[in-house]
Amino acid sequence: MESEDLSGRELTIDSIMNKVRDIKNKFKNEDLTDELSLNKISADTTDNSGTVNQIMMMANSPEDWLSLLLKLEKNSVPLSDALLNKLIGRYSQAIEALPPDKYGQNESFARIQVRFAELKAIQEPDDARDYFQMARANCKKFAFVHISFAQFELSQGNVKKSKQLLQEAVERGAVPLEMLEIALRNLNLQKKQLLSEEEKKTLSASMVLTAQESFSSSLGHLQNRNNSCDSRGQTTKARFLYGENMPPQDAEIGYRNSLKQTNKTKQSCPFGRVPVNLLNSPDCDVKTDDSVVPCFIKRQTSRSECRDLVVAGSKPSGNDSCELRNLKSVQNINCKEPLVSDEKSSELIITDSVTLKNKTESSLRAKLEETKEYQEPEVPESNQKQWQSKRKSACINENPVASSNQWQIPELARKVNIEKHTTFEQPVFSVSKQSPPMSASKWFDPKSICKTPSSNTLDDYMSCFRTPVVKNDFPPACQLSTPYGQPACFQQQQQQIPATPLQNLQVLASSSANECISVKGRIYSILKQIGSGGSSKVFQVLNEKKQIYAIKFVNLEEADNQTLDSYRNEIAYLNKLQQHSDKIIRLYDYEITDQYIYMVMECGNIDLNSWLKKKKSIDPWERKSYWKNMLEAVHTIHQHGIVHSDLKPANFLIVDGMLKLIDFGIANQMQPDTTSIVKDSQVGTVNYMPPEAIKDMSSSRENGKSKSKISPKSDVWSLGCILYYMTYGKTPFQHIINQISKLHAIIDPNHEIEFPDIPEKDLQDVLKCCLKRDPKQRISIPELLAHPYVQIQTHPGNQMAKGTTEEMKYVLGQLVGLNSPNSILKAAKTLYEHYSGGESHNSSSSKTFGKKREKK
């Protein structure tokens, strides 16, 4: 009897084991098929339009875009000009498809923005700064974004700017803080790399270790049959977190392509993996490495979407699985029902999803309330409020019943207010060291700090002087602040200053939070910061008469002699030149001390560089008008013996439809008896740099310093490059990526500049005359002002205007002597019939018309 029972049990066990093996083989085949299809989709580098369309139509998530872009980048080695342009185009397409206000807190989106800026730095370093600034503004919480920007500035020789970026990142509370501290230390040690490879590995290990400790302390010990850990998997995870460029196969860890899940009607979790359901796809599973890696939960702003990377124990040979039959306690999430073990590993069956009804959800909340006091570390209330304020509009689930089937296993590492939030929010990094909270600067309205950053560049000088939408009156009393402890002068007699065209506006600011600046006793209320660069900042301000101005503040505490001379020259040039031309930016007032400089200037709308980036096509008349404005402005400075030497679109500001020249910081004044000057250092922008400046850098040397010979014809070349950009949408040598090759092409007479055919032949002639490499053969500014391109065709127009005036005089003369309405009506009808017949006014028609009127 006992033998029969034993044999029956063995048969039952054998049948169960066969079923388990069948299920295992089924999952293996499904995973292999999915991986092959995923590789097939993403490995095609010739035409990815199909994959891109699928991404945009399906999830349109940063993770999918990043996976595709990294695969494209891997297959683009070695990187040629064509492949680089293609990569940049795909990155640009991804950024356009992902709104920053929605994905600003997403790490993958931050990596896309940073990598796009790095690729632009290879192709066009002059424009890369704008894209780094855009990434920094959109993804300010990630330390690797700030470090990448600082590394770029360091590579350009801007050590002070690099340090400023890192310090501001620390003040903003970017994480991880250790990374920023290491970068600052390396910068102070004058190292070329802010983060070395060894430091990256150290950061990787420390980050993973810290996260493991936090994971084990909050969720409890995860029991694994084999606790061996693949160090490569850990390092790869952490490397991915702080933005290091990795191979696509490593980058896919935790970023399972959503295209893969959409093809399945129902998925079961693979053996040995903990199921976590994404809010946007209840049936999808998360595939991980075979290593024990802690849980990193990412925050996003897309419809309460959180992507969790939950990793189970490693499997020695077979596949492990478990089943969550009942959710009885949040405190211990372990499998309590062991099944029959295999020869190599025990088998635990897990369900593919966890569904909570309203009753279960309420019990879960009660459990959480009970366990919060002794399970979770205390979080400062200020940080919790700040976290909630950032996610308030995007992470509140308004229908808990509808989303109950999308519940996720939370990481009990932070204190969560269940009454206000139904979505568990976690930081991207689990760091033991608390990051300092963001401190509001004394220069800003606190509300402006929390504002969603714009995607436009904020770093250009005089960038985007936009008139704010204003509603409230000027505050009767505002807090006066002068930087660095300088007292404001209130007792001086205020005098009238000319008003800008933007007048009688109201201020959108609170009367208590708005700060003011005092310049020579005049009080200006700060509206917002509109530009910054180096040690200077530009603010849009309002005076007591509701007039808009721009105040440029310069901190002189760390300024060297060259910087001091630069600003003094700028003030002197503006005072001198604004009296002779309205194409020069207006300087209304200024104040200079040993610690700072204030310059009250005219406030414009937008600089030419930003305007050109926004415009897809330029109206020919608009281009001609702006070209004439530029010529008149440069002609004015040349007449007073000044060569600008660094003309580019950012040096021109659009004010009420007119271009005005700004930024004389590096301009040089020529001696009266010379026709050219020699600069101590070459400072022009490469894309707009004249050939003679490049040649004389190497040929002319004095006292061990390279010299650059410039003349008024140098500004003509730069103006020609600007006009070329306005005509063809790029500079003449922008297509050359390598900077050394670009410099050689500029000075090489055998390198022909392309001038594609355009309808305006006179415009094409202007471009050819401006872009001649020999300064002696290059056209001058007076000749450009007399060129037919800038001359409106006056002769036909004058004749037409003259004829129209005569006709109008004739018509009025016929009507002026009539008194009765009937006579006026008859005369008007006769005139209408006369001109409708195509006849023009002449002496014979005048006599005929007079006879008709006499008869009538």
Swiss-Prot record:
It catalyses: L-seryl-[protein] + ATP = O-phospho-L-seryl-[protein] + ADP + H(+); L-threonyl-[protein] + ATP = O-phospho-L-threonyl-[protein] + ADP + H(+); L-tyrosyl-[protein] + ATP = O-phospho-L-tyrosyl-[protein] + ADP + H(+). Inhibited by the ATP-competitive kinase inhibitor, SP600125. It holds the Pfam family Pkinase. ATP binds at residues 530-538, 552. It comes from the Eukaryota. Disulfide bonds: none annotated. Its EC number is 2.7.12.1. SMART domains: S_TKc. Keywords: Acetylation, ATP-binding, Kinase, Nucleotide-binding, Phosphoprotein, Serine/threonine-protein kinase, Transferase, Tyrosine-protein kinase. InterPro entries: Kinase-like_dom_sf, Mps1_cat, Prot_kinase_dom, Protein_kinase_ATP_BS, Ser/Thr_kinase_AS, TPR-like_helical_dom_sf. The modification Phosphoserine is found at residues 7, 37, 80, 281, 317, 321, 363, 393, 435, 454, 820. The modification Phosphothreonine is found at residues 33, 360. The active site is at residue 646. Residues 369-392, 835-856 are annotated as: Disordered. Residues 835-846 have a biased composition (Low complexity). The modification N-acetylmethionine is found at residue 1. One of its GO terms (molecular function) is protein serine kinase activity. Residues 524-790 form the Protein kinase domain. CDD domains: PKc_Mps1. GO terms for cellular component: kinetochore; nucleus. GO terms for biological process: meiotic spindle assembly checkpoint signaling; mitotic spindle assembly checkpoint signaling; nuclear chromosome segregation; protein localization to kinetochore. Involved in mitotic spindle assembly checkpoint signaling, a process that delays anaphase until chromosomes are bioriented on the spindle, and in the repair of incorrect mitotic kinetochore-spindle microtubule attachments. Phosphorylates MAD1L1 to promote the mitotic spindle assembly checkpoint. Phosphorylates CDCA8/Borealin leading to enhanced AURKB activity at the kinetochore. Phosphorylates SKA3 at 'Ser-34' leading to dissociation of the SKA complex from microtubules and destabilization of microtubule-kinetochore attachments. Phosphorylates KNL1, KNTC1 and autophosphorylates. This is Dual specificity protein kinase TTK. It comes from Macaca fascicularis.
